[in-house]
């Protein structure tokens, strides 16, 4: 041992120094490799996605004051805030069908109750996120094969598992109900909040169980819509114009959670009718039809003759037959491979041109860009079986009426082009607008909509009406939400100022009255040839 020490002592000093440096570097490399390995494990298991979603949501939620203190269990009923709520007491047991349940001024009392274990089971799960999240052309990924759902949440590697709970709607109670979280942007923006978006499935595990003909209730939490009426007014516009679309109602939702809360108000939600077999049967009067929820920038791209290549992208919402599948694949071959002459001659065999033109006209009129015109999602597609023709259905309108901040500025969206209403490239619309007969039908539909439905006096009166119905429930929410609501629905608006950053939570509230007045002015001017309208040539890179 003493001999070894003497050998070490005789080594040159520089060599001892060099060996020490190698030891330090080796240790650092080992630490880096361990950190990288841990990062890979966390990435593949989805822990990074959960952490990121929590941080982003916390940033959003930090804008609003903390929830008001809520009386604990055992508080005398007379002291509970819900007893002083002046809203209506609607009885769901007296409602026989969807048309009576989904009335846009109905505000239903909805109670959701979970045990602590049920609430934990409801929370998001982590999966491997998509690698190519921010493409330079602005086309952020829409699908992630490693996640159980399509859309932004799935791309981030987030799942929405089903849990159980007790649900009461308008005094009608259901036990053992399947409930999960829902949505993409609204889900992420309320990730750490109690007021989450919910999907309630009364029939899951209980075949035939429904309320007013609906087995599924979509409770959208309005986190992105300070006016609380974008969905209600948007779907009504589509339906009145003759486009197949869901109906809406409102809900005042309360949460019961183990020993923590008995009936804690979460605030105002919009109830959107579920698009399913019942909705299809009513709209198509019982004839054969299929319903899809596509998630793709390349609608009707030819992917071959194997249905498995289409199924995940087109996400059927009802049971589809072999004939339905074959027709969709045939339409994809036609749209992808036909010449311009062939497309113009046969397009009416595959698409209901009046229905599609009507859908695009309404979508353009209300400047709804979080969907079909821009990002390849947030719409439905139906197939009329006997006719073999496809049409389009609106979905997710919480940022319609010029609100969606990822396309242009507020002023540009008010003046958006009706001749070229899509953003950047859109193969299907480019082909349709290249057909003179389609352009003629589209122009006639736009003129009819502006003449009969997009009428400022009528729409502004609707804003006032809905504001009066929902205000009592909004007043239960935070001071921040109440203030933003009043700004969104007030009759006057400030002069144009500098355009704020899209990620600024304090940016000016989108004014419904302003958009209605200014958009109508632009629509009339474009139809009269006095204005060309703003064309959005490029997509904004996501996250910029």
Residue ranges and their predicted role:
Residues 2-15:
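Juxtamembrane low-complexity tails/linkers enriched in Ser/Thr-Pro and polybasic
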Residues 12-33:
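N-terminal Sec-pathway targeting helices
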Residues 32-44, 367-368:
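Short hydrophobic alpha-helical membrane-anchoring segments
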Residues 42-236:
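Conserved NTP-binding catalytic cores of kinases and kinase-like/nucleotidyltransferase enzymes
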Residues 86-90, 99-100, 105-108, 118-127, ...:
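Middle-to-C-terminal accessory/interaction subdomains
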Residues 182, 256, 382-384:
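Short beta-strand micro-motifs enriched in acidic
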Residues 184-186, 190, 284-298, 397, ...:
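Short, His- and charge-rich active-site/binding loops that engage polyanionic ligands
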Residues 197-207, 211-216, 220-223, 227-228, ...:
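Internal "kinase-insert"/substrate-recognition segments embedded within catalytic cores
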